[in-house]
């Protein structure tokens, strides 16, 4: 695992390498939830070496000397809501760090039973959308902010309509669309001042 991370860092001259984290769902998880795979985040693993602007810290190699030199730290503002890793890597990328993905350094994570509930998963997507919007819209005003709002609204409407249409025939696809709708609802709520809710106490 670590050898795969180091090999990717060398091959792609990367400062940060992200690898996939595969969820291990608990017994009793419905088949349609497993098929929707809501806890898996695809960063383009099928394109190893792809450059990205942000990522998550679940399976990551970071060049420590770069972090020390740039003096970048996690922002405690995101300590309870989550998103501090997303913010951290965005700031690294803005300072010139090279962030890439690899599909060879794989990790697995056991998912607690209470995190495969529909209500939790949809609320998680709302929170994720708020975090994304709060980060993406920092310093953004005027037409670009309006364009972001219109984009989120259109995606919300399309995803909601799709979820309703697919529910009778494809529960997995319908749920994926519900998650997409929830994420865009979170983005819109952030535009009206909503802050990410605490993910833990």
Q: What annotation goes with each model-predicted range?
A:
Residues 1-32:
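Conserved donor NDP-sugar-binding/catalytic core segment of glycosyltransferases
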Residues 19-20, 34-53:
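Short, flexible, basic/aromatic active-site loop/helix in glycosyltransferases
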Residues 53, 60, 100:
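Residues that recognize and position ribonucleotide moieties
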Residues 56-71:
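Conserved nucleotide-sugar donor-binding
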Residues 65, 87, 106:
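Active-site phosphate/pyrophosphate-handling residues
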Residues 76-80, 97-119, 131:
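Active-site donor/metal-binding and catalytic loop motifs
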Residues 79-90:
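Acidic donor-binding loop at a coil-to-helix junction in glycosyltransferase catalytic cores
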Residues 123-130, 137, 141-201:
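Non-catalytic, C-terminal membrane-associated alpha-helical segments of glycosyltransferases
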């Amino acid at each position: 695992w670590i050898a795969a991370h180091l090999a990717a860092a060398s091959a792609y001259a990367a400062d940060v390498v992200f690898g996939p984290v595969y969820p291990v769902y608990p017994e009793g998880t419905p088949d349609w939830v497993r098929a929707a795979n809501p806890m898996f985040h695809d960063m383009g693993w099928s394109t190893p070496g792809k450059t990205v602007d942000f990522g998550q810290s679940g399976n990551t190699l970071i060049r420590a000397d770069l972090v020390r030199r740039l003096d970048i730290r996690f922002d405690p503002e995101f300590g309870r809501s989550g998103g501090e890793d997303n913010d951290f890597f965005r700031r690294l990328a803005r300072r010139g760090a090279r962030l890439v993905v690899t599909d060879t350094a794989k990790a697995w994570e056991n998912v607690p039973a209470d995190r495969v509930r529909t209500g939790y998963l949809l609320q998680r997507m709302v929170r994720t959308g708020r975090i994304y919007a709060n980060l993406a819209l920092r310093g953004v005003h005027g037409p670009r902010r309006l364009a972001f709002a219109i984009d989120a609204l259109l995606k919300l409407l399309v995803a909601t309509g799709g979820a309703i249409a697919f529910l009778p025939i494809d529960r997995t696809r319908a749920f994926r669309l519900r998650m997409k709708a929830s994420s865009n609802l979170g983005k819109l709520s952030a535009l009206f001042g909503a802050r990410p809710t605490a993910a833990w106490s």
